[in-house]
Amino acid sequence: MNVLVIGRGGREHALAWKFAQSEQVEKVYVAPGNEGMRDVATPVAIDENDFDALVLFAKENNIGLTFVGPEIPLMNGIVDRFEAEGLRVFGPNKAAAVIEGSKAFTKELMKKYDIPTAAYETFTNYEEAVAYIRKIGAPIVIKADGLAAGKGVTVAMTLEEALQAVKEMLQDVKFGEASKKVVIEEFLDGQEFSLMAFVNGTTVYPMVIAQDHKRAFDGDKGPNTGGMGAYSPVPQIPESAVEVAIETVLHPTAQAMIKEGRSFTGILYAGLILTNEGPKVIEFNARFGDPETEVVLPRLDNDLVDVCNSVLDGEKLVLKWSEEAVIGVVLASKGYPEVYEKGAIIGGLDTLEDAIVFHAGTAMKRGDFVTNGGRVLFVACKAKDLQEAKDKVYKEIAKIKSDGLFYRNDIGYRAIAKVDC
């Protein structure tokens, strides 16, 4: 069987890496992929939103399964198109992908079906939004309604921050159409965690949880990013809280989507926060999280082809997980998530020994890997516990030489502090 992964980042490299381990898979293609994926897959120079070319490629190359990584093709209906062409594809259709595409839709869904989340109001009028912020005060959370590459959320700790964020979104239209409507939420305090699941209609197969680090710098300082690192397991989140989240969030959401005529098949990602009142939803995504995928898939002992086929065919599935821990660190271009330069040479990758390296934003230039995006590399290590995994990953990262990269030095600190207590 040949597999096609759609996308170009670290998440897609991790998916290709996992599919390549299957004895059922003859060849893995990634469209468009990147040069760093050639260890496990063949990059194909087709943009992830060029549906005509992707369909043609799938037909001409005997693709038995297509897995869609990023959100934008899902929102644009790639699954609907592939299914209409009789092609086997894994991911939600356009109607179901709205759970990520519109925060306003999702908040209304949770309100209607009593799924625990923060109190909120939705605004398109700038003056009304400002009046609401002044009434509620800080801390407060401002979210662009649509997709903004993980950067459309401001957790404002001061009134000034909140007013600036809403001005940028509604008046300056910082994120284009995505921020012509904003969701303003109460600030929730607690530990965040990511709970992803394979879903087909009402059938939900939860994965092990992970925690990512969204702030750019050590100590959770600096601007929000798409994620600067992740780890799994998350010992500071009790198993009982995960069970509550599965029963009060994942199952009711899958059922709610069916009732709304938007039955969901694919990866449902719940970004959650454990409050004093229990787990509450911060966000939903309609696909694997990035960078969480890069620490969860190395713990999955099942063949990913079997998992996808069982989910698509409605067959019973038992997920098997390694007891080992995984910590992964993002190496990003200096300046990310704001303005950054490309083209810095990356050396030392061939000296890494006991690490998994996923390429996110690299290119090949005259025989050298160079930086070609905001998040450039994801380096992960697996070990018997989080402390050992952390020690290993930072030892390996020190071998990478580049003037154009930076990374956080404290990925996993909350969990390791918990274990040490």
Regions found by a protein language model. Give the residues of each.
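ATP-binding N-terminal substructure of ATP-dependent carboxylate-amine bond-forming enzymes
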Residues: 1-94
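Active-site nucleotide/adenylate-binding loops and adjacent lid/helix of ATP-dependent enzymes
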Residues: 4-5, 100-181, 235, 240-251
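Peripheral (often C-terminal) accessory segments that flank ATP-dependent C-N-forming ligase machineries
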Residues: 309-421
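Solvent-exposed alpha-helices and their adjacent loops that cap or buttress functional pockets
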Residues: 21, 36-38, 90, 112-114, ...
